[in-house]
Amino acid sequence: MTTVNLDLQNSLVAEKNRGKITQIIGPVMDISFLPGQMPNIYNCLTVKGKNASGDFIDVTCEVQQLLGDNKVRAVAMSATDGLMRGMEVIDTGSPLSVPVGETTLGRIFNVLGEPVDNLGPVDTSITFPIHRAAPAFTQLDTKLSIFETGIKVVDLLAPYRRGGKIGLFGGAGVGKTVLIMELINNIAKAHGGVSVFGGVGERTREGNDLYMEMKESKVINEENISESKVALVYGQMNEPPGARMRVGLTALTMAEYFRDVNKQDVLLFIDNIFRFVQAGSEVSALLGRMPSAVGYQPTLSTEMGTLQERITSTKEGSITSIQAVYVPADDLTDPAPATTFAHLDATTVLSRNLAAKGIYPAVDPLDSTSTMLQPWIVGEEHYETAQGVKETLQRYKELQDIIAILGLDELSEEDRLIVARARKIERFLSQPFFVAEVFTGSPGKYVSLIDTIKGFQMILSGELDHLPEQAFYLVGDIEEATAKAATIQVQSE
């Protein structure tokens, strides 16, 4: 009897529910099923067949709404060109699932978890569904701890929270990509962690450039792909909104495996979080929802919250997320960036002025913020040093107009000292990157938080007033700066 039941079960699994397309509106389609065979919300549906010219079509879509009358409305994950009414649709019976684990490292995937780098198939023995619940409240790690990056300006003035969310603001050409690659490199070396990069609705050229630069800087190891430190998931600008709306979840799912199963610290990069919202708004009207403020989807906060709540620290491991934020028309009150800000623990703002001076990383020390910079979290010493650095730089900024008009000589003795120290601080905030060794020629430096604090304390106290300011430019810790000063002195003699 049991054998008969098993056979019956197997035949039911093999016999998937089938429906037919009744309407296609751009990336959205309506599909009718037989009574009692309706798919669940978020189920993955596939359309396989031939178009009018005889070419093979394979489109995956995701159920978004149950319309009644045995109809569902679904969003396509790839172009709907060539689809026709009456085509057969198969319900896979489960949400979209993607490969996870070590096999993903060094590879590029699309939203469906298919490799798109022409390096052959990926082992799909372990897959996770992209729609998963956020960790339970009891599993969360409530300790506030700093995530050390080894980058002086970040660790001192706008420290990242382990398992926190960081917004990365900056225009074109100020060094976002290099900063991202350095963070990927440092987490692998210092924390033994891995990274997942989600390219959401950005330029395909940038995605390709990032891949090439990662291979050049050995973040992706071509000789031994399994030794790579990052997995890449791309859903670029040319993809339909369905893919751009879900590619962030695909990347997050891959990151969750490393956190929950491998118990590692993971860095998740999302470039760009605004495009995730934008894709949702493109689909929203087609799904028949009333637009809300500025034409955005009424479900904006829910969609953002569902994604962001899954990015967190548990007692097992952490996902620290760095999200590039595009601000439409530089309007910070726009609903998309405003909703994003509610979730961020820190902001890293890149400045074009610093990049123009040749100070890299071009992180603006006065505009970048962090909720972690509190004396009871980072300690009194770190807090006092950071405040001292900010005060000195702020005073220097105020004095710049006077210097431009009257010159340095017109300043008081005290102000001249502040300017000299501020210029040293500004230069000491720069540092050579491992991933930039190829084009700078100077070896990269990872500076521990203790060394960073010690260095800035010495500059603020006036111990190093006698050293030339160029000794502080592009060095690691303060010992290196004093050694460089000695070399400069010898050369000048």
UniProtKB/Swiss-Prot annotation:
InterPro entries: AAA+_ATPase, ATP-synt_VA_C, ATP_synth_F1_bsu, ATPase_a/bsu_AS, ATPase_alpha/beta_chains, ATPase_F1/V1/A1_a/bsu_N, ATPase_F1/V1/A1_a/bsu_N_sf, ATPase_F1/V1/A1_a/bsu_nucl-bd. It is a peripheral membrane protein. The keyword Translocase applies. GO terms for cellular component: chloroplast thylakoid membrane; mitochondrion; proton-transporting ATP synthase complex. ATP binds at G170, G171, A172, G173, V174, G175, K176, T177. It comes from the Eukaryota. It holds the Pfam family ATP-synt_ab_N. GO terms for molecular function: ATP binding; ATP hydrolysis activity; proton-transporting ATP synthase activity, rotational mechanism. Its EC number is 7.1.2.2. The keyword Transmembrane does not apply. Gene3D superfamilies: 2.40.10.170, Bovine Mitochondrial F1-atpase, Atp Synthase Beta Chain, Chain D, domain 3, P-loop containing nucleotide triphosphate hydrolases. It catalyses: ATP + H2O + 4 H(+)(in) = ADP + phosphate + 5 H(+)(out). One of its GO terms (biological process) is proton motive force-driven mitochondrial ATP synthesis. Produces ATP from ADP in the presence of a proton gradient across the membrane. The catalytic sites are hosted primarily by the beta subunits. Belongs to the ATPase alpha/beta chains family. This is ATP synthase subunit beta, chloroplastic. It comes from Chara vulgaris (Common stonewort).
